């Protein structure tokens, strides 16, 4: 087995960079590895139109390390009030590549999200017409639905209806976590794809709950049982172009995670491709990593693949115990633990 793995430079099709003083830290971490990233719009207030997306994009570009060519791909935050004109203006900008459906209350900063799917049908119709992708956080939020079942129920109650109603709309089912989601994507048309996180490939709910509650494993959608983890590994390593890399790296300050009511999100951007390599190596599928990380996403988005490369080397190193996060700190996933692959840094 080779101790070096060279890939076309990957992209991250789902990341949270946050805003303000933390941007120099979060942008540096993603730009170290990825050529482009789909930037989540769930700021406070959210990124609802092309003008706000451009302002956020400029802040991200200003935070890039010297010499970086990292490109942020912007996303609109759908609300009940999003209009077809909002969609057309965003598409015409050239820098907004998708719009994001957050069911209201489903995750961090989703309170302004969609309260009823039917309310955004005019916007979805416009998206289908102009070729803008729909990104979906696929969980219902009704209190009587068990948190471990919310993805499956969303598929049955909402997602099937959306893809049937808008067959030409390209849909990315983001950060899928269940066997049911894998099956849905596999059986859907070529216009439906999914992203998978490194933490959902490497971990299941036992890692979060057995032997004590580990808040840095807490994310939404929540980690599921190991049978679902196995389904995700099958999908990611299958070679299917329907599945591609999206870290959902979502930093929160240490005090907000280590809390009686801790925030949801795992910070993986600092070592994302290294973590994915571990997952693919578990399945003896390192030969499938380039497709998943570097090729399938651009193809689905209608963009060219990156032309430069990165190299991973099998060289054990210890993840930092904490990382700077503005004036605070963030605890990364695997803090203080050994990682088996290291990104080779070029001078």
UniProtKB/Swiss-Prot annotation:
It comes from Pseudomonas savastanoi pv. phaseolicola (strain 1448A / Race 6) (Pseudomonas syringae pv. phaseolicola (strain 1448A / Race 6)). NCBIfam families: pyrC_dimer (TIGR00856). Pfam families: Amidohydro_1. This is Dihydroorotase. It is an enzyme of class 3 (hydrolase). The active site is at 248. One of its GO terms (molecular function) is dihydroorotase activity. Homodimer. The lineage of its organism: Bacteria, Pseudomonadati, Pseudomonadota, Gammaproteobacteria, Pseudomonadales. Its cofactor is Zn(2+). PANTHER family: DIHYDROOROTASE (PTHR43137:SF1). Its EC number is 3.5.2.3. Substrate binds at residues 16-18, 42, 137, 220, 252, 264. One of its GO terms (biological process) is 'de novo' pyrimidine nucleobase biosynthetic process. Pathway: Pyrimidine metabolism; UMP biosynthesis via de novo pathway; (S)-dihydroorotate from bicarbonate: step 3/3. Zn(2+) 2 binds at residues 100, 137, 175. Belongs to the metallo-dependent hydrolases superfamily. DHOase family. Class II DHOase subfamily. Keywords: Hydrolase, Metal-binding, Pyrimidine biosynthesis, Zinc. HAMAP family: PyrC_classII.
